[in-house]
């Protein structure tokens, strides 16, 4: 996936800069999200990996997306097709979202807990992370029963492992020394 991310960065940056310039970030988020969903479809994936011409591939993706893509979105699809990069559309969307979140000063935080968190716990974690990161946060909560108890908090920059499993692993490592 890192190769696709590398490929996607310049397209996402260009699309984001254009969206900012045109005051159309929300529109571009919708367009790229729809195009990414189309490109992730198994039938479309197989079609995109065929040896058809770039023009034919671009026309097909644009046709499937229909009115979801404006002329600028269609131009992006054509450019990516010419460069044989249509398979990177989902990665472009992910990178684009990162630019939007950076622009809006929103940090994405993944919280994995042993049991589902209640609203109070979610609010406390969000408040603590907003204070630590000095920006708004968007929490993505997951449940992993293997943690035994506690939570693991992941951001782009760090991980806080407050799970019982993590504590047991650290204790086992210390005892082996």
UniProtKB/Swiss-Prot annotation:
| InterPro entries to which the protein is assigned, alphabetical | ATP_synth_OSCP/delta_N_sf, ATPase_OSCP/d_CS, ATPase_OSCP/dsu
List where in the cell it is found.
Cell inner membrane
Its cellular-component GO annotations read:
plasma membrane; proton-transporting ATP synthase complex
Name one process (GO BP) from the record.
Answer: proton motive force-driven ATP synthesis
Top-level taxon: Bacteria
> Electron transport: present as a keyword of the record?
no
The record's annotation in Pfam families points to:
OSCP
Q: Which UniProt keywords apply?
A: ATP synthesis, Cell inner membrane, Cell membrane, CF(1), Hydrogen ion transport, Ion transport, Membrane, Transport
Segments traversing the membrane: none
| Recorded topology in the membrane | Peripheral membrane protein
PROSITE patterns assigned to the protein according to its UniProt record, in alphabetical order = ATPASE_DELTA
Q: Which GO terms describe its molecular function?
A: proton-transporting ATP synthase activity, rotational mechanism
Among its keywords, does the record have Protein transport? no
Q: How does it assemble?
A: F-type ATPases have 2 components, F(1) - the catalytic core - and F(0) - the membrane proton channel. F(1) has five subunits: alpha(3), beta(3), gamma(1), delta(1), epsilon(1). F(0) has three main subunits: a(1), b(2) and c(10-14). The alpha and beta chains form an alternating ring which encloses part of the gamma chain. F(1) is attached to F(0) by a central stalk formed by the gamma and epsilon chains, while a peripheral stalk is formed by the delta and b chains.
What's the family? Belongs to the ATPase delta chain family.
What does it do? F(1)F(0) ATP synthase produces ATP from ADP in the presence of a proton or sodium gradient. F-type ATPases consist of two structural domains, F(1) containing the extramembraneous catalytic core and F(0) containing the membrane proton channel, linked together by a central stalk and a peripheral stalk. During catalysis, ATP synthesis in the catalytic domain of F(1) is coupled via a rotary mechanism of the central stalk subunits to proton translocation. This protein is part of the stalk that links CF(0) to CF(1). It either transmits conformational changes from CF(0) to CF(1) or is implicated in proton conduction.
Q: Please identify the protein, giving its name as recorded.
A: ATP synthase subunit delta
Species of origin: Haemophilus influenzae (strain ATCC 51907 / DSM 11121 / KW20 / Rd)
Gene behind the chain: atpH
